Amino acid sequence: KPIKIKNGYLIIKLNNKRVTTNKLIREFPCTLIHNNTFSFANASPDFRRKLLDRSIFIAENNFSKTWFTFYRTLKQRNTLLKNNRISDIYTWNKKLSNDGTLLNIFRKDFFKHTLDEFNFLVDLLNTSDFFAFFGTIKIHFYQGWNDDCSFLDILSNNYKKDLLRKTTIAGPHKSDIKFLINNIDARQILSRGEQKIFSVLWSCAQHRVLKKKYNIDATLIIDDVKSELDDRIFNVLIDLLNHINNQVIFSCIDDCFSS
């Protein structure tokens, strides 16, 4: 059996050989649009980081190692802070800084290309005709600390605050994608429908980056395509699919495509 559960663990085989999840993702790359994705703009920073990271996992072979190493080191540093092991913290700062800086480079690069593809799709679909906010929204990548300082400097400068709070308060684990309209958080301004179309466009833009920059033919999977979308946004999504030059798989409870 290619997929089975043994002792509570999922075991996956490819050509009769056990493979890791990372290997499977690269053999059968895919991106997903589902109900939670429709709330991308209004979701937590953690959700937006995960959505970005999932695409980078597919695109960059070294990202997985960098990601896991950073978060293991971060956990170790936070443990030292909780136990007041001050003398050991400086040793871990350097390693956390190296891994965190590299992780940040991966994210910023993928974000930049996603933003380019997002703007391309907005112009292509002329969505501003009925979603005027596209002409005023500004999208920024916040790396999790002040851009004017290195991550190592931030770790050193925040040492007393970290010790007081027993956790690392700045770094890639605090990064986010921020959306502003006239310097105001866009979530305070956009309607539910506007947030949905924004989220759909952003997800499709990430998908296009995989093809255009990395030449990865990822499958786009759209779950329950109609449930969260009104007819106007649904029609925009269908137009978008014409510009996705990969396989698309979707589920739909309603019979939306009968001729």
PLM features: what roles do these ranges have?
Residues 87-219, 228-232, 236-247, 256-258:
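Conserved NTPase motor "head" modules and their coupling/switch loops across ABC/AAA+ ATPases, GTPases
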Residues 33, 39-126, 142:
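An accessory alpha-helical subdomain
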Residues 251:
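Conserved D-loop beta-strand region of ABC ATPase nucleotide-binding domains
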Residues 6-7, 37-38, 144-146, 254-257:
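Conserved nucleotide-binding/hydrolysis micro-motifs of P-loop NTPases
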Residues 32, 219-221:
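Structural motif
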Residues 1-47, 53-63, 119, 156-160:
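Nucleotide-state sensing region of NTPase/ATPase domains
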Residues 223-225:
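Walker B catalytic acidic pair
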